[in-house]
C-alpha cells in the first residue's frame, strides 16, 4: 500500500511564482495530496515558522480565489484547504460554496474539535452539505471515543497531530501515540503537526500511519535554501515513504 505524502504550503509563499513552481514540482515528485494554508487572523495552533509564512504573504495577498483557481488548473490530485473555522463563522456557507466552485476537494479546520466541540457534528454536516469533504483534525488530548467518532465521519483521511503545535520540539513518544490511535481508527490515518525529523517520520510509519503531512520543514527549507532545496526534501521524504509501502 502506497503511503501518502500530504504536502502543506501556505498560499502564495514565498511569492506566487515560486509557490506555483513548488506545488507543481512537488506533485511530480510524489505528493499525493496538497494541503494549502489560508492565513488566519490568529494562528493559535500553528508554530512560529508557519505563522511567519502567513505574515509574509498577508502583506500583499488580498485575494485567495484567483491563486486557488490557478492551483486547481495545474494539478489533478486532491487539494485540502487548511484554515481556522473561527474566521469564517459569519460567512461559512459562502466560503464553502466558493471552495466547491473552484474545485477544492476538502477543508480542514484545526480548531473544529477543540474550540467547537459541542457543535462539531453540525459543522461537519454543513461542510459536506456544500459538496466539500470534511477532514477532521485530532490529537493526543482527545478522548478515545471522540477519536473513534471523528474517524468514522472524516473524509479522505483522519489527521492526527502528535504535538500541540507545529514546528515546536516537545518530547513525545511518537510511536506509542500512533500505536494507540491506530488501534482506534479504521479510516486512513495521516500523521503530522509536529513530526520533527526523519526519525519521527520513520516511527510514525512503523507504528501504522498511512501517510504523513509535512509543512514546516518545507517552509524552513525554502526560507533558508530556496525552492530547489525544498523540492529535494520532498523527493527524500517520498523515498522514505516508499520504503514502507
Curated annotation (Swiss-Prot):
Q: Which PROSITE patterns match?
A: TRP_SYNTHASE_ALPHA (PS00167)
In the UniProt record, does the keyword Nucleotide-binding occur?
A: no
Known catalytic reactions: (1S,2R)-1-C-(indol-3-yl)glycerol 3-phosphate + L-serine = D-glyceraldehyde 3-phosphate + L-tryptophan + H2O
* The UniProt record lists the keyword Translocase: no
| Spans through the membrane | none
Q: Name one Pfam family in it.
A: Trp_syntA
Q: In which pathway does it act?
A: Amino-acid biosynthesis; L-tryptophan biosynthesis; L-tryptophan from chorismate: step 5/5
UniProt keyword annotations, A-Z? Amino-acid biosynthesis, Aromatic amino acid biosynthesis, Lyase, Tryptophan biosynthesis
Active-site annotation:
35, 46
Record-level GO cellular component terms:
cytosol
Q: Which InterPro entries does the protein's record reference?
A: Aldolase_TIM (IPR013785), RibuloseP-bd_barrel (IPR011060), Trp_synthase_alpha_AS (IPR018204), Trp_synthase_suA (IPR002028)
Report the domain of life of the source organism.
Archaea
Q: What is its EC number?
A: 4.2.1.20
One function term, GO molecular function aspect: tryptophan synthase activity
Q: Describe the task this protein carries out.
A: The alpha subunit is responsible for the aldol cleavage of indoleglycerol phosphate to indole and glyceraldehyde 3-phosphate.
**Similarity-based family:** Belongs to the TrpA family.
PANTHER family, per database record: TRYPTOPHAN SYNTHASE ALPHA CHAIN, CHLOROPLASTIC, TRYPTOPHAN SYNTHASE, ALPHA CHAIN
Could you give the subunit structure recorded for this chain? Tetramer of two alpha and two beta chains.
Official protein name in the record: Tryptophan synthase alpha chain
Which organism is the protein's source?
Answer: Sulfurisphaera tokodaii (strain DSM 16993 / JCM 10545 / NBRC 100140 / 7)
